[in-house]
Amino acid sequence: MEIIDVISIAPTAEFGGKAKVNHYFYNAFNELWTSGIKDDFLSLKNKNPDYELWITGHSLGGAMASLAAATIASTKLFPLDKIKLVTFGEPRIGDKTYAELHDSLISYAYRIIHHHDIFPHEPPSWIYGYQHHKSEVWYDNDMAVGDAYVECDEDESKKCSESTVNLNPMDHQSYYNVKVIFANDGCAGFNPYKN
């Protein structure tokens, strides 16, 4: 992820009228959405009209998953009560208006955060007014089977990961004791940081 591009830019891409989101996240989502994902989604929806729609992602994928869920919900492409969003290490995507719009559209939305993962705290809320949508599930531990967690239904709760100051990028690399950073181990010859 081009972290400087992400954290140093105000949310400028318009979403749903008055809401603003980070252009880097929006462009990444929109590139995939308009390159065939939307058509594939609609085809699968028509073949399976009774299914729920589960959308998930980690890091940039979490931001894109949030935008996908909000896009599908706001354009009424799927019943709202059947949209389920679960992300891992999702960064802040947009402004308060986006967070409120997201909250009003998607009732089943959970941002899972591992211990001191730094990336859910980027871009900082005090820069350009970025704000998370709800709800947060915070594991202030190693995320082993049976480990305790705290659920916070507010958008930016001091009872969850906002209460910690010892942020660490290493906690972003594994969730539930599974290594999720593919660039180190997966996709031989693929460089996710290359344009």
Model-derived regions, located:
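A conserved cap/lid and substrate-binding interface adjacent to the catalytic center
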Residues: M1-T56, S74-K82, I106-S107, K194
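C-terminal His-loop and adjacent cap/lid subdomain of alpha/beta-hydrolase
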Residues: A13-Y26, Y128-N195
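Short glycine-centered, acidic/aromatic-flanked micro-motifs in structured strand/loop junctions
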Residues: I55-H58, T87
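Gly/Ala-rich beta-loop-alpha elbow adjacent to hydrolase catalytic centers
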Residues: G57-G61, A65
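Generic hydrophobic alpha-helical membrane-span motif
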Residues: M64-L67, P123
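Short glycine-enriched nucleophile-adjacent loop
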Residues: S66-S74
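The feature captures the conserved acid-bearing segment of alpha/beta-hydrolase catalytic domains
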Residues: L77-S157
